Amino acid sequence: MPRRDRIKPSFEDDESFENEFDYRYKRGKEQTSLNSDNENSESGSGSEQEEHENEHDVDDEMASISFGALNRAQARLKQEQLRRSQRDYESDSDSDSAPEETSSSSQPTNKKRSKHAPAVSSTKKPVSRIRDIPGLPSRKSQTLHSDIRFDAAYGKADLNQARKNYAFLDEYRKQEIANMESILKDKKSKLNESEKEEIRLQLQSLKSRMDSLKNRDLENLILKEYKKKQYQNVKEGKSSQPHFLKRSDKRKILQKAKFDSMKPKQRERAMERKRKKRLGKEFRQLEFRPLN
């Protein structure tokens, strides 16, 4: 059967279709509808022959479609399938879960957040049973070092009372100092130089700690005696009200009491350290600085 010549229509003039594929697709549908009408009116043998010819016509029409139109049609079909599958998935999830109300807070807004607004946390992170409150110690620090004697909830720590309660530790410190000195003096000891040096450092640290504790005890004793004397004067009528020391006066009284309690060699050593400190300060003030 000879192939019939066809004239392609100009799609630019046809405003009812977007592209060539829509035109071809609609024309094929019209041909199939005409064939179905002819089948009802004509006999079986004639209708089969015409149907066969019409199928060939539709195939020829589809074969003449350009590749660009086919690509666009394929992309549109993929988008439609994706949209349909997403719609089915959303309908399934909505049927399984309870209906939720859409709130305006879920929608993102460009409004600036207030600093007093509640904090936003992730829903993926499990909520702890004990929540951390800003401004208070964290739960981890409390579990690491928890000692009710030094808890802030019981008020400020009283160093004087703690010193009285643990005064018996001085005996252990003195005994430890004596043991270290005996080890260092023992010439038959099998310790190497590094171990001896470590013991010397520990001994020096322990002695300095004992000296600082003694100085603190002496300061507390002097201030306590001064307060007691002032209240005694008020009680006897020698003064109308007690005199409270300023920081500079307190420093002078403590320094005088320390020098009085020192031995002559200790006093000379302290005076020498003080003189060197003052001399170094004067040299730093008078040192030569080159002009730029």
From Swiss-Prot:
Associates with 90S and pre-40S pre-ribosomal particles. The keyword Amino-acid biosynthesis does not apply. Residues 48-62 have a biased composition (Acidic residues). Residues 35-47 have a biased composition (Low complexity). InterPro entries: RRP36. Residues 173-217 form a coiled coil. GO terms for biological process: maturation of SSU-rRNA from tricistronic rRNA transcript (SSU-rRNA, 5.8S rRNA, LSU-rRNA). Its main location: nucleus. Residues 1-145, 255-292 are annotated as: Disordered. Component of the 90S pre-ribosome involved in the maturation of rRNAs. Required for early cleavages of the pre-RNAs in the 40S ribosomal subunit maturation pathway. Belongs to the RRP36 family. The lineage of its organism: Eukaryota, Fungi, Dikarya, Ascomycota, Saccharomycotina. This is rRNA biogenesis protein RRP36. The keyword Membrane does not apply. Keywords: Coiled coil, Nucleus, Ribonucleoprotein, Ribosome biogenesis, rRNA processing.
